[in-house]
């Protein structure tokens, strides 16, 4: 067995003596395979005491477990089994819904939420309810134990009376027998309780995994638009599976307490009346008054939880958006704006959390104090009625009242958990009730055509759920009266302006829109590739093969066709290189080519490509088009949406769409010969821009060995050894630093000080109260009247209630402060982390920290700490009280407490590591669900949906193993600790009986009543301490983000104020001196000694092949990495001495992929509110945003797999959808389900750059995915607004920059190969620029003509 993991050396006080080292042992079988959990095959003894876990715990004490050796769950507990049961019951219940749905009933048991609840119950019916029966037996055994307490006290009374009367005392064996019987009764209850909770907790595990599996399966059947319609965006689904499903899991563990506790209370009422007669009714009358208030509190807690969920969802959505758009956030220095938004939502969430914590404190105080106050009232009434306080009756009744604390404490928790579970079921019910869509057009292999559409109308509708109180807004788009016949083997191209419906048309062919009328059928299965490439976490090979059969010949052919062979040769592990979430470590062109390779890897008779070549430069585009399009198999039908005019002449037929209708269709020659035709107008207007590219495509073949030059800079990947970081795993005990950090976050000077004072008041009253009752019964102070006894006893009871209320309330503030501080520190640290952190960390992992782990801090860990401190106080009080009466108990309890501690120490390493493994295996579930939903259209089109669903089940089964074993280990500990508790009862019982000649019956009653009441507290204390250490994993993970995530250089520096006053940079001159730059530590430099001077007001174009360092130059300029040597000067100021906030705000940046954030258009343009509306409207007019309809391009959503519109229909057409309302500054924008097309997003990106009015303007391939018309319009806007400003442009179309640039900088292998005017560089024979122009088909005359056009425009 590998010993790669080992605990740090243990301190002597953390070691369990007399244990041999088991680190060399393994849980694997002789063949090295994982075993099925031995629970089912265990002997009755091992099953009863959970001893089948002994090997697991023994090894876990010696060394950390690893996931690959843990027991597997049996096939009967597989996720597929219970997911199938759940789905079957849901469908069965849906079929039995009566006509009208039962809406007239007061309780509609056929509502979606009730159906889901009943289906959950039916899925685990026998296992769950046998656990309930066991819990009932345990509760009855516990609540009837005072009968034996009374019998023992009677025995003491009889012994005392007979001894005084000189009569023979009862046989001591009789007393010992009753003490043993009391212990056995409690022991039987312990065993039933442990197994009852085991079944309840594991039922939660089974239902949790079944819910996640079923929810993922159902939502994966929806398109992004359909999910938006049902309010099931990706962030909300992640919230559901991380929070709501976990609450149902938690509710299962405590559900049975909601009814068994009531039975306990009723039995207690009967027994108390039997002891105290009618006087008991006064105590229970007080309970009848106070306990219902708990129900109101629980209801209000439920309401508060419900109110907080929208804020939680909004916070998680804001975090997800910030992470997804982190490059935009960085280059615009928007961290503080996003932090402010997230903090506002968190504060709203915390206000409700504070109210919940204080209400919970009142509830806890009531639950614990009501029995005490009821006992006070009952005993005072009993005495006031003239009854003599009989020790047997009084102390058995006191035991009953004190035992009521457990059900009364448990009831609020149980009802709260049930309320949370009910709330979660209501939130989940909508997803489970949504009708499953029927995706895909019918396929008929017998038809002649590849695609046949006749008189069809297709549409989608998106509902806006942003404001649940208002009427839901619906946006829609339609393609009407479509009649399209695509022949088999045909190259069919689709063109059109913005809002024309090109992407919607492709989406309809893969079943992502709704066919309203008409007829549509496919002749074969279709493979689809969107324009915005989607990749999954994994290796490049995994992304291309995508779970399909391995075919090396086909694979190599696909790599060659997509020009990936040269790229793979530069990667450290070739095609086994891990590329990260959505291929974040690849350039844009590389991502697109990998996605295209995946689409064509398995030959398909019908290919649907949505403008997939726009992100490629001319060279690579030419070769890929040649091999993928022009040299495709003769029988392959290719439908291509394109903005590249030079490709149109290769089409067999072209379809021109406009405003959702087919405007014209025919061959290239036919459409060019049509006077006044749409396509002829566009081609004649913009053909000159693509002439060079057209010539290049005609050439067909490229020179051998020419590396790809598509957009983006892949240099950061060439030396990468591990692109995605594995999630950190903590080993060993939770450090003192972790506990100290958590305590410091809770403002301990205030909270802990007052907590200790209130705990002393509470515990003092708890110890003195039974002693005073004893003295009252014995008449210890003859001078005191009965009324005085009553008054003091009542005062002690009230002091307990006040002390407990203060203690719980103050600790509620501690939880509130710590939750507030930990979240604030973690999110600040993450947002200010360098971009390399996000390149190597899956976003799903980060969002999991801020969902599941924050939920644990808000609702679990603090409460666990409070309960631990309370139990410690109770244990100390119990030991003190019983030792006053029975000094020998101190010696016995010392031995047993040592056993308690050693048992806990033996258990904790295994429990801690299992919980950590559970957390580590849980993150991949969220990551897989998130990235799969983002790419669901691609997954479905490739027929990989079932593989994706199977992977999710595999992840769930993997996580269920440590989770189930963790629960089982808790029961292993509970059995042993609670049996030790019964040993304490037995010891006290035997000592009391054995000391009958030296103690009074009242003293014996105090000792017995107290030990029976608190015996479980001893075990609970150890168990709670272990549970806290297990749950501290959430604190560890968030503190890691708070303190250990690397941070960017300071965003603010002392000299920034002076630069602001000087309005730096006024000119925009840039100078780079010997700059060496790397994207992150451990990588080879991407820039190697760069020297470059950019005069103020100069327009410079960066060109070069892939990996040459173009994008890296821009990253260095805005501080998106580490400059390890050299300096960058802007207007004579070293940028390393400037705060990143000022630096990035003073450089206007327009990235290739335009991103938006949820909020208003005003928020997207100016999140800090630095500009007035007049300025914002001015830039909106300049870029054309003010004339855009708010819904004009929602149709482009169908082409994206990422719940955001694709960069498809990028041009802006004000005429489209003129009936819609125009964009205003207050128009709401949704990042995930935006109504904006990619073109509109690009214009927003341009507007937010222009509003800065910066002297330096940077465009990083900003027009790569735009059509000719929008590109032309954008260039005109830039020329008009950027005169006199320093402009740096990266462009993959060389002809688009040679005419407009004053200087050309040619990058090669991280160095400046050439820099000068276009004509000067072209004149250098053998130079890099001359070579690039030659490869692009550009000659000297082309450069002259391009410059002439720019100057004259």
Swiss-Prot record:
Gene Ontology cellular component list:
plasma membrane
- Tell me where in this chain the ABC transmembrane type-1 domain is found: 129-420, 756-1030
Q: Name one Pfam family in it.
A: ABC_tran
User: Where are the bilayer-spanning segments?
Assistant: 40-60, 124-144, 172-192, 250-270, 271-291, 364-384, 397-417, 748-768, 796-816, 864-882, 888-907, 973-993, 1002-1022
Q: Which SUPFAM superfamilies does UniProt cross-reference here?
A: ABC transporter transmembrane region, P-loop containing nucleoside triphosphate hydrolases
Q: Where in the cell is it found?
A: Cell membrane
Q: What is its main location?
A: membrane
Residue ranges of every copy of the ABC transporter domain listed in the record? 460-684, 1070-1334
Q: Which residues bind ATP?
A: 496-503, 1104-1111
- Which Gene3D superfamilies is this protein grouped with? ABC transporter type 1, transmembrane domain (1.20.1560.10), P-loop containing nucleotide triphosphate hydrolases (3.40.50.300)
The annotated region (Disordered) lies at: 687-720, 1191-1223
Q: Which SMART domains match?
A: AAA
Glycosylation is annotated at 121, 481
Single GO MF annotation: ATP hydrolysis activity
Recorded family membership: Belongs to the ABC transporter superfamily. ABCC family. Conjugate transporter (TC 3.A.1.208) subfamily.
Record's function text? Multidrug resistance protein; part of the gene cluster 14 that mediates the biosynthesis of a ferrichrome A-like siderophors which may contribute to organismal virulence.
Its name, as the record gives it, is ABC-type transporter MYCGRDRAFT_41235
Q: Which organism is it from?
A: Zymoseptoria tritici (strain CBS 115943 / IPO323) (Speckled leaf blotch fungus)
């Amino acid at each position: 067995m590998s010993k790669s993991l080992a605990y740090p050396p243990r301190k002597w006080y953390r070691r369990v003596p007399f244990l041999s080292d088991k680190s060399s042992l393994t849980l694997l079988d002789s063949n090295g395979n994982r075993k099925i959990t031995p629970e089912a095959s265990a002997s009755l003894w091992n099953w009863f005491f959970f001893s089948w876990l002994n090997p697991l715990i023994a090894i876990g004490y010696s060394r950390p477990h690893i996931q690959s050796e843990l027991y597997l769950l049996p096939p009967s507990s597989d996720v597929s089994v219970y997911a199938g049961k759940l789905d079957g019951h849901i469908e069965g219940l849906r079929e039995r819904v009566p006509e009208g749905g039962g809406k007239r009933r007061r309780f509609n048991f056929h509502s979606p939420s009730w159906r889901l609840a009943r289906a959950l119950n039916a899925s685990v019916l026998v296992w769950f309810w046998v656990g309930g029966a066991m819990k009932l037996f345990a509760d009855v055994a516990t609540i009837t134990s005072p009968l034996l307490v009374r019998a023992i006290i009677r025995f003491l009374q009889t012994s005392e009376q007979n001894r005084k009367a000189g009569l023979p005392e009862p046989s001591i064996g009789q007393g010992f027998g009753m003490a043993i019987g009391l212990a056995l009764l409690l022991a039987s209850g312990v065993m039933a309780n442990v197994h009852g909770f085991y079944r309840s907790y594991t039922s939660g595990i089974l239902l949790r995994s079944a819910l996640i599996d079923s929810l993922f399966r159902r939502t994966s059947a929806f398109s992004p638009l359909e999910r938006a319609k049902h309010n099931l965006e990706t962030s909300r689904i992640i919230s559901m599976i991380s929070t709501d499903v976990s609450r149902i899991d938690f509710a299962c563990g405590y559900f049975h307490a909601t009814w068994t506790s009531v039975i306990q209370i009723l039995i207690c009422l009967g027994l108390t009346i039997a002891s105290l007669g009618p006087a008991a009714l006064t105590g229970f009358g007080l309970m009848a008054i106070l306990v219902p208030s708990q129900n109101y509190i629980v209801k209000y807690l439920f309401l508060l939880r419900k109110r907080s969920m929208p804020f939680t969802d909004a916070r998680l959505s804001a975090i997800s958006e910030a992470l997804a758009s982190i490059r935009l956030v960085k280059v615009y220095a928007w961290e503080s704006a996003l932090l402010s938004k997230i903090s506002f939502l968190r504060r709203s969430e915390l206000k409700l959390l504070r109210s919940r914590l204080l209400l919970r404190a009142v509830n806890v105080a009531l639950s614990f104090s009501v029995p005490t106050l009821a006992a006070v009232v009952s005993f005072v009434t009993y005495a006031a009625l003239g009854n003599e306080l009989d020790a047997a009756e009084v102390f058995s009744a006191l035991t009953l009242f004190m035992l009521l604390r457990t059900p009364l404490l448990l009831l609020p928790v149980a009802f709260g958990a049930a309320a949370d579970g009910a709330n979660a079921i209501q939130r989940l019910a909508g997803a489970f009730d949504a009708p499953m869509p029927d995706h895909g057009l019918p396929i008929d292999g017998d038809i002649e055509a590849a695609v046949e559409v006749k008189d069809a109308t297709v549409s989608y509708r998106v509902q806006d759920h942003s404001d649940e109180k208002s009427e839901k807004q619906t946006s829609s788009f339609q393609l009407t009266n479509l009649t399209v016949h695509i022949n088999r083997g045909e190259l069919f191209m689709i063109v059109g302006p913005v809002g024309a419906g090109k992407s919607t048309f492709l989406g309809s062919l893969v079943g992502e829109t709704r066919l309203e009328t008409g007829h549509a059928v496919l002749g074969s299965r279709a493979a689809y590739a969107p324009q915005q490439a989607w990749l999954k976490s994994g290796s490049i090979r995994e992304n291309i093969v995508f779970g399909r059969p391995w075919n090396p010949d086909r694979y190599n052919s696909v790599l060659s066709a997509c020009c990936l062979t040269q790229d793979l040769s530069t990667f450290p592990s070739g095609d086994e290189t891990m590329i990260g979430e959505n291929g974040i470590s690849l350039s844009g062109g590389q991502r697109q080519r990998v996605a295209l390779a995946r689409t064509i890897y398995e030959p398909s008779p019908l290919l649907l490509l949505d403008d997939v070549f726009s992100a490629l430069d001319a060279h690579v585009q030419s070769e890929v088009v040649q091999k993928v399009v022009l040299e495709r198999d003769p029988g392959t039908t290719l439908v291509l949406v394109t903005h590249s005019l030079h490709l149109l002449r290769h089409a067999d037929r072209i379809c021109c769409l406009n405003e959702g209708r087919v405007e014209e269709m025919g061959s290239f020659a036919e459409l060019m010969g049509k006077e006044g035709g749409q396509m002829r107008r566009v081609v004649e207007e913009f053909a000159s821009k693509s002439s060079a590219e057209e010539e290049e495509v005609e050439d067909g073949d490229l020179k051998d060995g020419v590396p790809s030059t598509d957009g983006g800079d892949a240099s950061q990947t060439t030396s990468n050894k591990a692109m995605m970081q594995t999630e950190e795993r903590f080993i060993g005990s939770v450090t003192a630093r972790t506990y100290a950090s958590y305590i410091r976050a809770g403002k301990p000077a205030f909270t802990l000080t007052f907590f200790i004072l209130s705990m002393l008041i509470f515990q003092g009253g708890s110890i003195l109260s039974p002693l005073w009752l004893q003295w009252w019964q014995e008449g210890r102070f003859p001078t005191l009247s009965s009324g005085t006894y009553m008054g003091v006893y009542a005062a002690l009871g009230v002091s307990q209630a006040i002390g407990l209320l203060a203690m719980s309330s103050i600790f509620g503030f501690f939880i509130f402060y710590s939750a507030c501080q930990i979240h604030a520190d973690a999110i600040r640290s993450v947002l200010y982390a360098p971009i390399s952190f996000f390149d190597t960390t899956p976003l799903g992992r980060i969002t999991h920290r801020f969902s599941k782990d924050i939920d644990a801090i808000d609702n679990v860990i603090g409460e666990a700490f409070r309960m631990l401190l309370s139990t410690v106080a109770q244990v100390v009080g119990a030991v003190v009280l019983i030792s006053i009466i029975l000094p020998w108990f101190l010696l016995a309890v010392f031995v047993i407490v040592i056993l308690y501690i050693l048992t806990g120490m033996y258990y904790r390493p295994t429990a801690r590591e299992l919980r950590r493994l559970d957390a580590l295996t849980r993150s991949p579930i969220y990551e897989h669900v998130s990235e799969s939903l983002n790419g669901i259209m691609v997954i479905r089109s490739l027929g990989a949906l079932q593989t994706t669903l199977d992977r999710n089940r595999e992840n769930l089964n993997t996580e269920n193993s440590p989770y189930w074993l963790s629960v089982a280990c808790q029961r292993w500990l509970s059995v042993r600790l609670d049996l030790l508790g019964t040993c304490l009862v037995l010891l006290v019982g035997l000592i009391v009986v054995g000391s009958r000649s030296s103690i009074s019956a009242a003293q014996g009653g105090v000792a017995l009543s107290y030990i029976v009441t608190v015996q479980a507290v001893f075990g609970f204390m150890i168990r709670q301490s272990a549970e806290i250490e297990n749950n501290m994993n959430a604190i560890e993970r968030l503190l890691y983000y708070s303190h250990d995530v690397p941070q960017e250089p300071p965003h603010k520096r002392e000299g920034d104020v002076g630069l602001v006053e000087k309005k730096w940079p006024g000119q925009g001159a840039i100078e780079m001196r010997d700059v060496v730059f790397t994207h992150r530590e451990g990588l080879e430099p991407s820039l190697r000694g760069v020297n470059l001077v950019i005069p103020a007001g100069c327009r410079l174009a960066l060109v070069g092949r892939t990996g040459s360092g173009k994008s890296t130059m821009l990253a260095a300029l805005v501080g998106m990495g580490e400059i390890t040597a050299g300096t960058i000067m802007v207007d004579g100021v070293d940028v390393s001495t400037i705060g990143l906030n000022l630096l990035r705000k003073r450089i206007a940046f327009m990235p290739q992929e335009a991103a938006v954030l949820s909020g208003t258009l005003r928020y997207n343009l100016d999140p800090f509110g630095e500009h007035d509306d007049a300025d914002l409207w001015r830039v909106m007019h300049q870029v054309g945003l003010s004339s855009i309809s708010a819904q004009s391009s929602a149709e482009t959503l169908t082409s994206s797999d990422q719940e955001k519109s694709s960069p498809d229909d990028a041009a802006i057409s004000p005429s489209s959808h003129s009936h819609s309302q125009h964009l205003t500054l207050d128009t709401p924008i949704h990042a995930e389900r935006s109504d904006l097309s990619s073109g509109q997003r690009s214009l927003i990106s341009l507007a937010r750059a222009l509003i800065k009015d910066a002297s330096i303007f940077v465009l990083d391939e900003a027009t790569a995915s735009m059509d000719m018309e929008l590109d032309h319009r954008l260039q005109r806007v830039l020329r008009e607004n950027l005169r006199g400003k320093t402009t740096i442009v990266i462009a993959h179309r060389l002809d688009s920059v040679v005419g407009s640039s004053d200087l050309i900088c040619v990058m090669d292998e991280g160095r400046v190969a050439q820099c000068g005017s276009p004509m000067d560089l072209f004149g250098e024979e053998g130079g890099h620029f001359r070579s690039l122009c030659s490869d692009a088909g550009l000659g000297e005359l082309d450069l002259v003509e391009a410059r002439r056009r720019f100057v004259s425009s």
